[in-house]
Regions:
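Short, mixed charged/polar active-site loops
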Residues: 123, 128-132
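Sec-dependent signal peptide recognition
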Residues: 2-7
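Bacterial signal peptide processing site
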Residues: 16-18
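C-terminal motif of bacterial Sec signal peptides marking the signal peptidase cleavage site
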Residues: 12-14
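Secreted/periplasmic proteins
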Residues: 24-116, 126, 138-146, 156-193
Length: 193
């Protein structure tokens, strides 16, 4: 019975939804792809890892959980989906499918000095793949390992439209206090207007 349910979920996930296609891509971030500035977090920080210094907070090895908030295509698929995110890019919610971000609780931010917009890294412990991200959403106390769809994709973690991961992937999330002002090093990825 479980196999049938999984096959049905996979079949539904692969269906083409032309009505919602405009919500599923088209550029970095949840906002107008022509209004992006370096530093929005679409790539790594200028100066790379060395610019960030030592991590102020680490999740330790934890099970990856996918946050679909900010991605309009997640509505009705993820039971915990929310249209808005705590952080914003160009005045709009941060789209989980297009922007690598991590989720931290207010308590985790308070004890570590990390703020919205600070840089983070996500590492897939099985493969060693690491991606840069920003802290862009607030979650419940005690939560760890919650990452955006884009961050999961960046480290090779597969997931279903309802936010369930394929398998039981583990990640380490590190966040770096006081790094929000470090611009992204991504001018080649920006769209000129």
């Amino acid at each position: 019975m479980k196999r049938i349910a999984i096959l049905l979920i996979l079949a539904l996930a692969s269906c083409d939804d032309d009505e919602r296609a405009d919500l599923q891509g088209g550029g970095p971030g949840s906002s107008d792809p022509n209004n992006i500035v370096a530093g929005d977090g679409f790539c790594g920080p200028q100066g790379g890892s060395s610019a960030l210094g030592q991590a102020s907070w680490s999740s330790g090895v934890t099970t990856a959980k996918i946050d679909t908030d900010g991605n309009p295509a997640g509505q009705g698929l993820d039971p915990k989906w929310q249209a808005d995110t705590t952080g914003h890019v160009n005045g709009q919610a941060v789209n989980s499918a297009q922007y690598a971000y991590v989720v931290m609780s207010q308590r985790q931010m308070d004890t570590s000095g990390v703020s919205m917009g600070d840089w983070a890294t996500v590492t897939n412990t099985a493969t060693g793949q690491t991606t840069f991200a920003r802290v862009e959403d607030r979650g419940p106390d005690g939560g760890t390992g919650e990452i955006s769809q884009a961050a999961a994709t960046g480290v090779g973690i597969e997931f279903l439209p309802n936010s369930f991961t394929v398998g039981d992937p583990s990640v380490v999330v590190n966040a770096y206090a006081g790094t929000a002002s470090i611009d992204g090093d991504c001018p080649s990825q920006l769209t000129e207007t």
